[in-house]
Amino acid sequence: SQDTVFRIYSMTKPVTGVAMMILFEEGKWRLDDPVTRYVPEFKNLRVVKSISKDGKMELEDMKRPPTMREIMSHTAGFGYGLADEHPVDKMFREKEVLSSTSLKQMVDRVATIPLMFQPGTNWYYSASVDIQGYIVEKLSGQTLGQFMQNRIFAPLKMPDTAFFTGPEKANRLAAVYMFDRDLGKIVEAKQLFGVDMPDYTKPPAAESGGGGLVSTTMDYARFSQMLANGGELDGVRILSPATVELMGTNVIPKNVLVSNNGTGVASFNEAVGFGLDFQVATDA
């Protein structure tokens, strides 16, 4: 029904992107700033130079830190730890980056893992939007959830969008199902990408800007319509038209458009690119 609350996973990413761009419009950061200006924990990141047949990585120094533009377009070099078997993704799983108990702990764990490639040289679906969530908190002085509530959800009248439902809406939360190959049938999911399903009725230990929100179809439609309208809905302006246009403009050079997706299930082609926290059509 229209009242059903869903875990929206990576549809959280454009919301975090809007939060970032609100702060961008306030002059809190610039696209070509090094991310180390806001996350100094990343100053000593190493980079994978090569991988041997037995999976051992040869590392080198960063030629330069990733820029804010690159963390918003998945070209910074971070891994994710989802389905891919790249050694960096394995380290994300081993260090339980996606199970961190705070965004600071998440950043500290990422800081111990090398980048997959030199910043700006490739595209890889990554944990960079979770890093953006940490930056939103640092620049705003609020938790990510508080900032989103104050600057996005309340103004747009999105009452059912948050990082948890609370007990009063628990009965409206849709279950997640998956196909169990061993049982040969569809069952309720207990894990996703090897991570235990969190209790979405309670506040999370770490608010994931990359995939932690719950929402309804009607709430998310209002968010989407705001973007389609150039940053405004029902007389409430969240972003300027120029900023929304900037978000939807491809920022990926042609030489890195065709690249494996970090989840191992998709790839870019010449008709699509990536803007600031969402994919864009380049032939529209």
Feature annotation, model-predicted:
Residues 5, 10, 58-61:
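Short gly/ser-rich anion-binding loops that grip negatively charged ligand groups
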Residues 40-284:
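Short, surface-exposed loop or secondary-structure junction motifs
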Residues 2-7, 204-205:
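Short pre-catalytic strand/loop immediately N-terminal to key active-site residues, enriched for Gly-Thr
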Residues 1, 36, 248:
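Residue-level detector of conserved, well-ordered beta-strand and adjacent loop positions
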Residues 7-39, 129-137, 220-223:
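Active-site SXXK
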